[in-house]
Amino acid sequence: MGQKVNPVGLRIGVIRDWESKWYAGKDYADFLHEDLKIREFISKRLSDASVSKVEIERAANRVNITIHTAKPGMVIGKGGSEVEALRKALNSLTGKRVHINILEIKRADLDAQLVADNIARQLENRISFRRAQKQQIQRTMRAGAQGVKTMVSGRLGGADIARSEYYSEGTVPLHTLRADIDYATSEADTTYGKLGVKVWIYRGEVLPTKKKTEEGGK
């Protein structure tokens, strides 16, 4: 069932880590909803800053947030003004002390979330879904991917009946757990309704580090 399951969730504990890192007993539901609020708030506030993912860690009454973005300058702002305003807003939203880290994404064309968002924005600007997918696949392969697959679903070209069309290049081994596959979804709001975008990017295998064993008596 490797074709059906989310490739990121399948690899957690193998080559991937959790995006929310905390432990909770009876506060689990409250923390979970707080995480959802934080991610939704950051997504809306930094909608133009190419944010890929938000990692959240908790310790006592403190929340550490790591924002992965392709445009760190836009998130930080002049003299750190934007990130400080964001921190204050999150302080009031959560009622806790918030610390924000910014991590730059060096190659945006190898990040599935940024690629999916880019295709969705092109679809909203009335660019052909075929052209948008093919151009993005070429850019991703040139950036160093070993394989990429994209799929757009919905009323393509304003058709009465919704359908899905996908394009792929290279290999995307979904069953291989050591394969570093990034997966993301996005949505495009068009005049005919919503279009769904899915992206799979295969960035190569992640090999476990070999432990050096000393051989005695030689």
Curated annotation (Swiss-Prot):
Pfam families: KH_2, Ribosomal_S3_C. The keyword RNA-binding applies. One of its GO terms (cellular component) is cytosolic small ribosomal subunit. SMART domains: KH (SM00322). The keyword rRNA-binding applies. PROSITE patterns: KH_TYPE_2, RIBOSOMAL_S3. GO terms for biological process: translation. Residues 38-106 form the KH type-2 domain. It comes from the Bacteria. GO terms for molecular function: mRNA binding; rRNA binding; structural constituent of ribosome. Binds the lower part of the 30S subunit head. Binds mRNA in the 70S ribosome, positioning it for translation. Part of the 30S ribosomal subunit. Forms a tight complex with proteins S10 and S14. NCBIfam families: rpsC_bact. Belongs to the universal ribosomal protein uS3 family. This is Small ribosomal subunit protein uS3. It comes from Bacillus velezensis (strain DSM 23117 / BGSC 10A6 / LMG 26770 / FZB42).
